[in-house]
């Protein structure tokens, strides 16, 4: 599905309950809204052009700014306000994923080795 945005357009490539993959096109000088996600991580991989990613930390007292060029990647943690600004026309892959617990296992039995 392709959706128009004030900053360009986004095309949803794949999504399920814990992961989304989008191809975005951005227009020079445009920016997305300053926003945050409650549970989702957000990743940006630039394939063409230049994109600034701003992330506000410590309740707005500190703002990190990262300039991404072709082949560069950055991530934004859940709960962090962020925004991107297009330095040039370009394209990027935008990924969203939910954090999961790597120790998410509840054992009812214990595995056994084969007898020797």
Where are these regions (language model features)?
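A short, N-terminal "cap"/entry segment at the start of jelly-roll beta-barrel domains
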Residues: 1-23, 31-34, 64-69, 108-116
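Double-stranded beta-helix
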Residues: 3-4, 85-116
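Catalytic phosphate/metal-binding cores of nucleic-acid and nucleotide-processing enzymes, i.e., regions
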Residues: 19, 79-83, 87-88
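Short, well-structured hydrophobic secondary-structure segments
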Residues: 24-44
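Glycine- and acidic-residue-biased ligand/ion/polar-headgroup-sensing regions
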Residues: 39-58
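Short acidic-glycine-tyrosine-enriched beta hairpin
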Residues: 57-79
